[in-house]
Regions:
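Conserved alpha/beta core of the MobA/IspD/sugar-nucleotide pyrophosphorylase nucleotidyltransferase superfamily
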Residues: 3-9, 177-274
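Active-site glycine-centered loops adjacent to acidic/histidine catalytic or metal-binding residues
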Residues: 15, 114, 141
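Residue-level signal for inorganic ion chemistry
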Residues: 11, 46, 96, 114, ...
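A structural signal for short hydrophobic beta-strand segments in well-ordered beta-sheet cores
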Residues: 29, 151-153, 239
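Short N-terminal binding/cap micro-motifs at the start of the first secondary-structure element
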Residues: 17-21, 146
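Conserved core of the sugar-phosphate nucleotidyltransferase
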Residues: 118-209
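Conserved N-terminal catalytic core of the sugar/cofactor nucleotidyltransferase
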Residues: 1-8, 19, 36-128
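A conserved hydrophobic helix/loop-capping motif in glycosyltransferases and polysaccharide synthases
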Residues: 8-14, 31
Length: 274
């Protein structure tokens, strides 16, 4: 077995997950083993993620139903970082700035709070990629890439991560060449990440979202922007590709929750049989 690399981990668990209707809780606490209903059971998603991450200090980004998150994970010796506003993945990392500054690790692993099937081996490969790059992105090839952000790659380097709303207007030939999608899971050299946080904070993007039945303009920060900042500064981002897109499956609605619970059941059967 390969030696595990110690890293500081940040898990984004602040959002509500508005598509998970009629569930009213924090979606990272949904069960992988349903009992009374799909929404009640054992093996919370977030706990599974924390168990799979490499060794080292861990911070959970909280906001919505934060006390519920703390209650279910307090036995796991994690740090909680409050994200005052739900203002994007970059906003979540900015909320963890003090944790990152104090972490006694050379690297940082960043993951979403709804992707429970990422294997320890994939985290290790991401961290090993930091030997040659300053940042590493976990990519996957989906059966349908619509709605996903894509990695724009040159050789072994990721030049930028482009969201669906932008790349869908690319010429057909260019669209066809973009096959690797962004999982939202990263490894970054800690000092380089800290260096670019002030730049990220100074460059919010304006997005339009519905709030109380009305479309409003709000400021959000996107962690993916750091890839372009690094490239502009002469640094590089690499990538690692998963073998199976189910490994990076996010759970954001009832259909994906049911798929995840069935996948987890099959995984448990395989382990028992072995």
């Amino acid at each position: 077995m390969s030696e595990q690399i110690r890293t500081a981990s940040v898990i984004m668990a602040a959002g509500r997950g508005s598509r998970m209707t009629p569930y009213e809780g924090n979606k990272t606490l949904l069960p992988l083993i349903p009992e009374k209903s799909f929404f009640e059971g054992k093996e919370p998603i977030l706990v599974r993620i924390l168990q799979m991450l490499p060794p080292g200090p861990k911070a959970v980004i909280v906001n919505y139903k934060s006390q519920d998150v703390k209650t279910l994970t307090q036995h796991m010796r994690v740090v909680y970082c409050h994200q005052p506003e739900l203002n994007g993945t970059g906003g979540a990392i900015l909320a963890a700035r003090d944790f990152l500054a104090d972490a006694d690790c050379e690297s940082v692993t960043i993951t979403m709070g709804d992707v429970p099937f990422v294997r320890p081996e994939s985290y290790r490969r991401l961290l090993e990629t930091l030997k040659n790059h300053h940042m590493a992105v976990l990519g996957f090839i989906p059966s349908d890439k619509k709605r996903y952000g894509v990695l724009e790659i040159s050789g072994e380097k990721v030049e930028r991560i482009t969201e669906w709303k932008y790349w869908r207007s690319y010429p057909d030939a260019k669209q066809s060449s973009l096959n690797i999608c962004n999982s939202g899971i990263y490894a970054v050299r800690r000092q380089e990440l800290l260096k670019f946080l002030p730049i990220l904070e100074s460059r919010p993007q304006i997005v339009h979202k519905e709030r109380n039945g009305q479309m409003v303009a709000i400021q959000e920060y996107f962690l993916t922007d750091i890839v372009e900042y690094m490239n502009a500064d002469g640094l590089s981002a690499g990538y690692v590709l998963t073998a199976d897109e189910s490994e990076t499956m996010g759970i954001d609605d009832l259909e994906s929750l049911q798929k995840a619970q069935e996948l987890y059941r099959k995984m448990a059967v395989k382990v028992t049989a072995a």
